[in-house]
Amino acid sequence: MAAGQREARPQVSLTFEDVAVLFTWDEWRKLAPSQRNLYRDVMLENYRNLVSLGLSFTKPKVISLLQQGEDPWEVEKDSSGVSSLGCKSTPKMTKSTQTQDSFQEQIRKRLKRDEPWNFISERSCIYEEKLKKQQDKNENLQIISVAHTKILTVDRSHKNVEFGQNFYLKSVFIKQQRFAKEKTPSKCEIQRNSFKQNSNLLNQSKIKTAEKRYKCSTCEKAFIHNSSLRKHQKNHTGEKLFKCKECLKAFSQSSALIQHQRTHTGEKPYICKECGKAFSHSASLCKHLRTHTVEKCYRCKECGKSFSRRSGLFIHQKIHAQENPHKYNPGRKASSYSTSLSGSQKIHLRKKSYLCNECGNTFKSSSSLRYHQRIHTGEKPFKCSECGRAFSQSASLIQHERIHTGEKPYRCNECGKGFTSISRLNRHRIIHTGEKLYNCNECGKALSSHSTLIIHERIHTGEKPCKCKVCGKAFRQSSALIQHQRMHTGERPYKCNECDKTFRCNSSLSNHQRIHTGEKPYRCLECGMSFGQSAALIQHQRIHTGEKPFKCNTCGKTFRQSSSLIAHQRIHTGEKPYECNACGKLFSQRSSLTNHYKIHIEEDSLKADLHV
């Protein structure tokens, strides 16, 4: 009879307000843009999860605003003409505002005790209290926290003006599942009314808690769901069922394939709302957001210094290791220094447990660590059979071999041009977008990437770190040094398929191939004249602008081209490098030698006529 009464008792239904995170206007306006973006993501995901559980309720106004990309606040005028906040206008929401005010008092108390505080709705706390009371009445209810916990952490990166202290926010959404036990402890009947769509839990009638009961026999890692275990086991078996149709690269998981396909399509769905920069992976966006928030969440417990990256903390800790070598003993596993990290940082370390002792970077697998360590050791086991060039990774060799085969699997959607690597395609796309986010502090020139900015700045500093060991000549870029070294070795790895002519660099081959194709992609906007090379277009545009950037230090004469300046300087130096093979006469310019040859040709033709 008691059991029947227990079954008839109404359930505590989960509503949106139970999991909603509410802010007052003062709290909201003090949040950084990156914090607001993450709050928006959390709230929308909470709403989607509730909808997927089959709960029926009208869409909250705050969700409609967030879906439209607006702030969860609307300033409206009431009948008295006084401004009020739109999403707090109803009596129900006004009550929620009062709850928030009392909640702020609790926050102030927590801050005085230097405790972290959580923005969780008051109704959620009341809901948990109800469940606790029912448990105390021996109703044998259990709450299972499963599947999704989302944490918004902005550790000491946002100053709260009102409270006068730094704080971090946690927005935690926990899906709460209720299971009613029967008298027999080995069986349980799942309450199906509230969670009809949660099919993966309905099929598991023996679950009592969210324990990880599916264990991998190879590495003993445990999982909550059997499907997660099966995905994980593919890492050991090497099974890769998901294949890219573009380049035939295979992956063990469909999510990895989807991410990879963005390299071909160029899709970048993760956009920074601060600067508009787009990324193909959410992890890349998270890293980028740190540049705006200046978040430094890795703190040294020895001296209190903070770092935005784990590798920075690790390198810093080596200073303390020299002072106290017995205290710090960095090893192969990242857990060897995890004692110096906070709880949230240790969560990241569980995912990346292999640590590089040289630079502090962490990796998910020992194989990834071995690949990385070749950067430090200089080991290059993968050699090209065509030209003998060696590489540290097989992927780099495959990419290099495309130079010899002519394969270009990465194609630009705008102009159809093909490329051997995704990095080259991304660099090319900037031509169409015109995006230049990096400015030089010296001359104000805008550049498309941080790496090109660093190389450009060396023009002003005069730094040339790449030095040739044969002749001692120095260069600003490593690529320029590699091309130069081919002059000494005689290596010409780039071959034209039309005429078999070989070249030292890929750009020279590309320019040469336009002779065969007749392609002239560089067009002057002033007169419409087209050119096969960008350098030729730049030189031509100086005719319209009148710019003459090359100046003779001796007489002050200026020139449009560097070659014209070099030829002119020979007037002052008296240098004559061009010699006639027929009579030995010397010339300062090649064009003068060419004209001189015509004299000998005419003489030869006259002699031939006389003999006839």
Swiss-Prot record:
The keyword Nucleus applies. Residues 14-85 form the KRAB domain. There is a cross-link at K150, K175 (Glycyl lysine isopeptide (Lys-Gly) (interchain with G-Cter in SUMO2)). GO terms for molecular function: chromatin binding; DNA-binding transcription factor activity, RNA polymerase II-specific; RNA polymerase II cis-regulatory region sequence-specific DNA binding; transcription corepressor activity; zinc ion binding. The keyword DNA-binding applies. GO terms for biological process: negative regulation of transcription by RNA polymerase II; regulation of transcription by RNA polymerase II. Disulfide bonds: none annotated. InterPro entries: KRAB, KRAB_dom_sf, Znf_C2H2_sf, Znf_C2H2_type. PROSITE patterns: KRAB, ZINC_FINGER_C2H2_1, ZINC_FINGER_C2H2_2. Residues 76-102, 320-340 are annotated as: Disordered. GO terms for cellular component: nucleus. Keywords: DNA-binding, Isopeptide bond, Metal-binding, Nucleus, Repeat, Transcription, Transcription regulation, Ubl conjugation, Zinc, Zinc-finger. It holds the Pfam family KRAB. Transcriptional repressor that binds DNA upon activation by RAS proteins signal transduction to initiate transcriptional silencing through the recruitment of additional DNA-binding proteins, multisubunit complexes and chromatin-modifying activities to establish a platform for DNMT1 recruitment. This is Zinc finger protein 354B. It comes from Homo sapiens (Human). The gene is ZNF354B.
